[in-house]
């Protein structure tokens, strides 16, 4: 399995502002 890279951003609305990151509630990963 691939270890997700944490983007250092939290996501409450389901979207992430950091480019290339996706919401894996409650944090953004890529």
From Swiss-Prot:
InterPro entries: Cyclotide, Cyclotide_moebius_CS, Cyclotide_sf. GO terms for biological process: defense response. This is a cyclic peptide. There is a cross-link at residues 1-30 (Cyclopeptide (Ser-Lys)). Pfam families: Cyclotide. The keyword Disulfide bond applies. The presence of a 'disulfide through disulfide knot' structurally defines this protein as a knottin. Belongs to the cyclotide family. Moebius subfamily. Probably participates in a plant defense mechanism. This is Cyclotide psyleio E. The lineage of its organism: Eukaryota, Viridiplantae, Streptophyta, Embryophyta, Tracheophyta.
